[in-house]
Amino acid sequence: MATIKDIANLAGVSHGTVSNVLNKKGNVSVQKINLVENAVRQLGFKPNAQAKQLKQGKTNRVAIIVPKLHIKRYGDLYAGVAFVLNDSDYDLTIYSTDDSGEKETKLVDTICAENPSALIVISASLQRIARYKDSMLFYVERRVSDPDAFFYAFDFERAGTELAESAVKNGRRKVAVFCGPARYSCNEDFVRGCISVLKNAGCRCSVFYSEESMCANTAFAIVSDDAAFDAVLVFGHENEEYVKTAHAYYNPASPLQIFTVTNKSMMHGFETSAYELNYKYLGCRIAQRILHKTSETEKECILPADGFLNPSEAPRRIAKREQINLLTLNSPTAYALKALAPSFAAKTGIALKIITMPYDELYKAALESRDSKAYDLIRLDMAWLTEIGGAIFLPIDLSSDPYKTISESFSTKIPRDYYYSDNKIVALPFDISAQMLYYRKDLFEDSLIRRSFFETTKRQLTLPKTYAEYDEIASFFTKSRNKKSPTDYGTSLVIGSSVTAACEFLPRYRSYGGRFYDDTGHIKVTDPLFRKTLIEHIKSAECIPKHTLNWWSEAMNEFASGNTAMTVVFCNHASAIMHYKNSEFVNKIGFSQVPGGFPLLGGGSIGISKNTVKLDAVREFFLWLYSDHTASMISYLGGYINNKKLLSDIDILSLYPWIAGVDAAMADGRRHDEVPNAAFNEYRFEKILGSSIRSALFGILDVDSAIAEAQKNLDAAFNR
């Protein structure tokens, strides 16, 4: 087996140099990194991470011990822990005890002998574990008497209470309660919650505890019981399947409703009686505690349940069939809505017709809708809402339902720009967005590339905080400037239209403190800072693809292809990365704040046309659109509807991790300036500014002529 000494001899470098390269320290030249890496490949060297960690006195191992591997909620727990630890130097392993206390004891002894960083246990023995040194110990779901350990679980008693309340509300009076052994606290708490409600309601009820190995037999005992139960309250997806199978075999014609406390799943819909517990998020919280990325100080953490899917605000079927027409931008969210529209029609009897248009056409159609009954709902770009929202939309009262309940699902970071026009609430946030920086993590973390960047620029390769740093990195990753660049271009610009060109320029200008109006409201772009920024912006365009990108989705496709190292794009178009065919970089994408810290807000809001007569149908559409389930489904499909619960949906965050950064981008971002000029119009301003910027970028006009043209047109539009 090759050793570090063998590598040093073959590479012709010192033992310390080999160690520095293997540990990815940035103090080694590119030449020596290449020598060491070539020697490693030739010798087939595999570093023994465990031996290294044991030498340090502690391994970066995290072990999860569960009763059964096939139980879905335990798989979710593992997935949640893995989601957080994936980007850390931790080795995560899951073990099964087969719900045997004896096997658990042996496993714990074996694992603790290797001194793991953390041990996560769903205990079969309920015996306190003698921890090894400073390992963190977490008991999950089943309480164990150990004041030194952490305990993470859900409020199982409340879950039982709410499950039983739902059964009673549905008219069930003969109820069976089915769960695992009573010795485990989760089952005991669940049964307590169920029984308290059922007895108070005068229901006939029986409790069926069962070992996992006997659950199928217990399910048959329930469906064949002389009590002829009309409902079963079940703890666990697997037990639900046992009951369904037993019922199908024994007496499929008899009425039996199953209410289940289960893991979170996108497959649950409004019709199901699934009460969700988010075990992936539970695992995520435990992993954050392991990494000390939480402010929690208590040893015990009881998380709230996700519960039923919008139990009181699910859409209902209306008396007569209707069609509502939605005018919106051609976007990922519109695409997702079209895919889900048949589901909405099936639930409510309301047909949803979605009319999509490009950006400029949508603006014109929205203006013309003042005198038209063609649309019941209109999606406006948030940059236009202040200007025309009050003229075309009905007011919305967020203090009364359903809008009060709907608004409670939104992030508190969403600014008023998505709601207000003429100081009245006339719209709800729809496909809200903000600019974010997307970058290739594999490039920014590569030790050879990092050293090459240092030798070229004399600074470390880190995420750009300023546009000067951004331009320097873009230049390094542009092949025409650096022949060894792994990408053809450092970045991209979307300059296919005047509005997109303005959106690319404004964050850079604002990051330097730029302002395009004076204290009197005079709109001006003739100051030296504007000229300096435009020259810099034109220079940065030397690091972008030669073909013109017309829209943000095209920039994301360019990025997903591996052709560019980084890009700044509105986040509601970022899903294009995941949907790009044959991308090798899907799991190598990072996101961050835009350089300079002044992202533009984007996306749109949705309002009710003043001319609609279908207010009941519109109400049901909003209930459906903003439900937790629909918001999740739209996000799965690549769109985005803001909902607080998305931040704990690990499946969605695994697909689209930048959703976790939307709140921060919203807090930092802006689109409007409070311009003291009554004639000012955001849409016209961006069109005028962007047109002149494009002329300068394409070499149609020199910088001074482009600025003069912009000022002339701005004067005509706003400074009369």
Predicted region positions:
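Hinge/lid segment of periplasmic solute-binding proteins
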Residues: M382-M436, K588-S592, L655
